[in-house]
A protein has these predicted regions:
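Short acidic/polar active-site loop segments enriched in Thr and Asp
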Residues: 2, 51, 108
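Conserved, mostly hydrophobic/aromatic
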Residues: 11, 37, 55, 87, ...
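Conserved glycine-rich "GG(E/T)P / GGGxP" loop and the immediately following alpha-helix
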Residues: 21-27, 46-79, 85, 90-101, ...
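Hydrophobic alpha-helical membrane-association signature
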Residues: 33-37, 71
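A short, N-terminal amphipathic alpha-helix
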Residues: 37-48
Length: 122
């Protein structure tokens, strides 16, 4: 099985329990990161079809709609035959527009980060 993982290190807030590589969301950083992703794909000549694509983080759902669409456009050459296309989401950064965008870009699996069901602990 051929798999591709794309790390989106941006978060709206930094959680004390998280050990993953992450930084605060800033629009200009996201734009530079997406441009660097394009460069890396071209420079390393990454190609081919993948069985699974997983977009993790950080909090990928913290990106705005235009940034998410740019990310999906960047990854589209690798998702033509994908069986499982996953993105990590935080319920705080989700809305119907993002869900629609995910569906329109063939996301077929969400990984929802639930640390607690107690509001006072969030």
């Amino acid at each position: 099985m051929k798999s591709l993982y794309v790390h989106i290190p941006f978060c709206d807030h930094i959680c004390a329990y998280c050990d993953f590589c992450k930084v605060f969301y800033k629009t200009e950083w996201v734009e530079k990161y997406l441009d660097a992703l394009v460069y890396e794909i071209q420079h390393k000549q990454i190609s081919g079809n993948y069985d699974t694509v997983y977009i993790g983080g950080g909090t990928p759902s913290s990106l705005n709609l235009l940034q998410l669409q740019k990310l999906f456009d960047i990854l589209s050459p690798f998702t033509k035959c994908v069986k499982e296309f996953t993105i990590e989401v935080n319920p705080e950064s989700m809305d119907q527009e993002k869900i629609d965008l995910f569906v329109n870009n063939s996301i077929n699996r969400l990984s929802v980060g639930v640390q607690t069901f107690q509001d006072k602990l969030l």
